[in-house]
Each structure stands twice: as structure tokens, then as C-alpha cells.
Amino acid sequence: MKVGIIGSGGREHAICHALNIIKKVKQIYCFPGNAGTARIAKNISVNLENFNELKYLIISNKIDLIVVGPEKPLVDGVVDFLEANKIKVFGPSKLASQLEGSKIFTKNLCEKYNIPTAKFGIFENIDDAVQFVCKAKYPLVIKADGLASGKGVYICENDFESKLAIKEIFDGKFGVAKNLLIEEFLRGEEMSYFIISDGKTIKKFGTAQDHKRVLEGDKGKNTGGMGAYSPSRLINEELDKKIMSRIIEPTIKGLNEMGTKYRGFLYVGLMIVENDPYLIEYNVRMGDPECQTILPKLKSDLLEIILSCCNEKLNETEIKWHNKKSLCVVLCSKGYPDKFKKNILIQNLNKIKLNQNEYCYHAGTNIIKEEVYAIGGRVLNFVCLSQNFLDARTKVINSINSLNWSGGFYRKDIGYKVIDE
């Protein structure tokens, strides 16, 4: 079977790696992929906004299945387009992808189906938003409505910070902004919860604790994710049941009533307040770096799981996991998430010795004249499975240090709440 993967990040390399070990998979194509996927798949350069070009490449290479990694093609409707052209594709429809594409869409769904979430207001212009925050209680949360690569969220402590956030959003920092949300600040701990669904059956696909802030101790600016560990230390049987019954099941039901089945991975961003879950956000794909953290724990055949979803037979498939802890640290280009240099040579990659249960997934990398260069903010993901998180983190940091790359930096405290406290 020939499989195509859309995307170029660490998530896509992790998916590529998981599919590459399956005997039934004869060839993998990545659109466009990175230096890591190039070792186990055929990378094909493509404009992901040109669906006709993508269709031509899929048909001409006789690809049997497409797996969509990132959110933008999903929100833009790539699944609907490929299905209309009789191409088997794994991922949610354009309408279902509005769960991530529009925070307002999701908030309205929460209201209709009584899904617990923070209280909120929707604002269409600067004046109304500023007028509201001047009378509001702090802290509060301000969010850009559309896609923002995980960075369009501000936690504001005063009027000055709120006004700056409002101005940046309406000035187009995260693309054209027609609306923004202002939410109450929930005091609790964040957790990432994953499921896979074919629109009828829902199955759990792991939990993780992401580290969004760029600096140690969860300080500094928001990023796409500096590292993660799995499982989350917050999860327990009672909380698990609440998440499924109060949040996920009503969401899938609501989409069905709108006329679209949710088929694909769903990433549920939660705030846990005294063991009660509140929805912060939905992402309509696996997280990054959570995907890199969770997939190495998967014991079952990923291709079989994906195909069962495409064929609405997920209820017939059992998903099994290795009973181990997993921890991921992201190596970033210096300067990230602000300006950083591109096309920086990464030496010593071949000198890294990865033992069993250790992985290095590429993200913002490219091959130029047979050498690997950093071209993105998040560059490499180092992952380790172990019986405990401290051992996993120690081995990951040893691997990063053996690389000795002067152009990068990373957080040394990933997992600190489960290891150091």
C-alpha cells in the first residue's frame, strides 16, 4: 500500500516513522516532508494551497491513502476536495475542522450542548473590546478567533496588556481578524487529551502535558510547544469519564446533528479545576509535540487504526499501548519564537547514538547538498520511553548534548511538575 502524508513537522515525521514499520506499507510520500522523512519516504515539494496540484501528484504516484497532519489544509477543506475526487483521506471535513478554525464556532457549540468552558464575550472591533476590558476583572484571556499556530492567546493582568493584545490581534498579527474572544481566566492546570473517531465510535488516544512557554519555569512567550510528557499526571478514572461524557461525546453528537461526521484525531485542550474538566480549545489533528510523545507508545498497527476510521469500523479495532512513560524535548533555533536565523548547518547528526526506545524526529529541517540544515523555529524532537520520567528526560538531554549544536536551545525542565516537585 502507498501512503501519503501532508505536512512537514515533527508530528508528520512521527506519523511517517510509525507507518514505515508496518509491512503492508510499501511506500510513503510526504508533501513536502523534511530532512527526517527524506530518509524513509519520498519527499515531494508542493503548494499545499493548490489542491489540484496535490490531487495530480497523488493520482500520478498511485497513492492509496492520504493522512493530513497540520490544521490549515484541514480548515481549508482538503479532505472534502480529495473525497470528491475519490481519494481515500484520513482527517475531518471542512465543517468539522471549524472546531479549530473558529474559536467562536466552538464556543457556540459549547453553549448549545452545555459543554463546560470559560465564560466569554465576542468582540468585532477595537473600541468595544477596549471598553469591556477597562471594566473587567483580571486576569483575563484574550484570543484571536482563527488559526494562530498555537500563539494567538494572551493572558492579561491589566488594562495595558489587554489593550496591547487587542491591538495586535486586530492589526493582523495572526492574519485578518474579524473577531476576538475575551474569556474569564480559569485557575487550574492544563492537560492535552486525545481521541480518534470515525464519527460513530470514539476511542481514547492518550494524554499529555505540553509546555507552551519558551523559557524554563513556564516563563516567556507562547510557542508551538517546547516539549511534552505522556501520560498526564492529572488523569484519573473519574476525570477520564467526565471528559468523555461532558465534553467529547456532546461535541461529536453536535457535529453529527450539523450533518458532518467527525473522522480523525481530535486534540482536546483542557483546564482541570478541582478534578473537573473545562474545554479551552479543540485542535482537529494530533498535537505537536504531543504526537511525537504519544505515538512511540502505540503497540497497535497505526495503518489498521486509520483505515478502520476511514471505513467507519473503528468499533472493530482494539488500540493497545506500551505501559511506559514518554518524554519529548524540542530543540529550537536561537531566537525562536521571535526572529531566528535560517539555513543553519546541523553537524554531528550522524554521531547521535539512539538506543532502543529513543527517537529523534525532525521538524524545521531541510537537506541541502546532502547536509541537514535548520530552516524553522522548532528543529528537532528528542523522545525517550522509559519506566520513569526522570530517566527519560536524562537520556533525551544526553542525546541533545551529544549533538553539540551551537545554533539551538531547549528547555531543560520539561516534565518538572512530575519529576522535580
Model-derived features: where do they sit?
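ATP-binding N-terminal substructure of ATP-dependent carboxylate-amine bond-forming enzymes
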Residues: M1-K94
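Short acidic-hydrophobic, aromatic-tinged amphipathic segments that line or gate anion-handling sites
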Residues: N43-E49, G121-N125, C156
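A conserved helix-loop-beta module that forms one wall/lid of the active-site cleft
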Residues: F90-K151
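Internal nucleotide-binding/catalytic subdomain
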Residues: G152-C291
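Active-site "cap" helix and flanking loop/linker of ATP-utilizing ligase/carboxylase catalytic domains
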Residues: M244-L266, N283-Q356, I368-E370
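Generic C-terminus detector
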Residues: T365-K369, Y373-E421
